[in-house]
């Protein structure tokens, strides 16, 4: 599991082509690894 540079340390990706995206859902905001 590797951590993306644009993501918090709690979000990591297992694949090299994964990218981190910020999901905005009121009232929460969180990062998700999208492969």
Swiss-Prot record:
Post-translational modification as stated in the protein's UniProt record: Contains 4 disulfide bonds.
Key words, A-Z: Disulfide bond, Hydroxylation, Secreted, Toxin
Subcellular location: Secreted
Residue numbers of 4-hydroxyproline PTMs: 8
One cellular component (GO) term of this entry: extracellular region
Annotated transmembrane regions: none
Keyword flag Secreted: yes
GO MF: toxin activity
Protein name in the entry: Conotoxin Ca15a
Domain comment in the entry: The cysteine framework is XV (C-C-CC-C-C-C-C).
């Amino acid at each position: 599991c590797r951590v993306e540079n644009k993501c918090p340390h709690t979000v990591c990706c297992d694949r090299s082509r994964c990218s981190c995206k910020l999901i905005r859902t009121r009232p929460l905001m969180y990062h998700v690894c999208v492969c």
